[in-house]
């Protein structure tokens, strides 16, 4: 299972580079990334395969990891560029009673999701 790490950084040039350099320097690949500026701070969600090693690298570089959660790094989404694909997928997840806490696109048209029931989501995705 993959890990979603939330890193809080200053909203300034170079903050994202610091994250990439810390992970790259430790041989850790970023599978997916989402970032936004919120109230003058940068909030970055990262999907990595080795959460403990990524956390160690980030904190070793003086970066603040504010949250960590198990994440599903799903297979490539068929028709990812077609209108309605995400809506149809999200409807199936909602109909199964699963709450999506975080979702973003990863490399290779894969999707990263942190949910209220990752095991149930994995079963559902196997049948999509």
Regions picked out by a protein language model, each given a short descriptive name:
Residues 1-128:
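A conserved regulatory-domain signal marking ACT and ACT-like small-molecule sensing domains
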């Amino acid at each position: 299972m993959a890990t979603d790490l939330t890193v809080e950084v200053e909203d300034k040039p170079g903050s994202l580079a610091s994250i990439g350099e810390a992970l790259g320097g430790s041989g850790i690949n970023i599978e997916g990334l989402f970032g936004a500026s919120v109230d003058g701070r940068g909030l970055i969600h990262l999907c990595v395969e080795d959460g403990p090693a990524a956390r160690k690298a980030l904190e070793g570089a003086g970066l603040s990891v504010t949250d960590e959660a198990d994440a599903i790094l799903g297979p490539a989404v068929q028709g990812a560029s077609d209108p309605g694909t995400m809506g149809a997928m999200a409807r199936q997840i909602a109909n199964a009673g699963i709450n999506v806490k975080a979702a973003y696109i990863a490399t290779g048209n894969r999707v990263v999701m942190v949910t209220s029931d990752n095991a149930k989501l994995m079963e559902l995705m196997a049948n999509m």
